[in-house]
Amino acid sequence: TYSDASGASENSTRWGVDKPLYKDLIGRTKAALKKNPKNVLFAVVWMQGEFDFGGTPVNHAAQFGALVDKFRADLADMAGQCVGGSAGGVPWICGDTTYFWKQKNESTYQTVYGSYKNKTE
């Protein structure tokens, strides 16, 4: 669950457009930018965990792309505080937090994590 006062709850394990973790991400980002007009968003660091291991990896790239697009659209009104003066120009740096996937199911790992590699949009 999500509330403006406390952010995403501890049991919020799902990410995606308009999910509790997304609302927390956009809410905290906007709060940080509003706190000081001199604050600038230089990048978003996305750490891919293992929760998606049991999901539908073929849908991951499209769902992640939709999340990034929504984030950038939701920050459009704060473009002046984004690197390069555009929310669309804020890079997403993607990493992973576990090698469990790679050891247990290389193809699932490559489907999900591999979709981040060499993306420039």
Q: Where do the PLM segments sit?
A:
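Cell-envelope and extracellular/periplasmic
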Residues: T1-E121
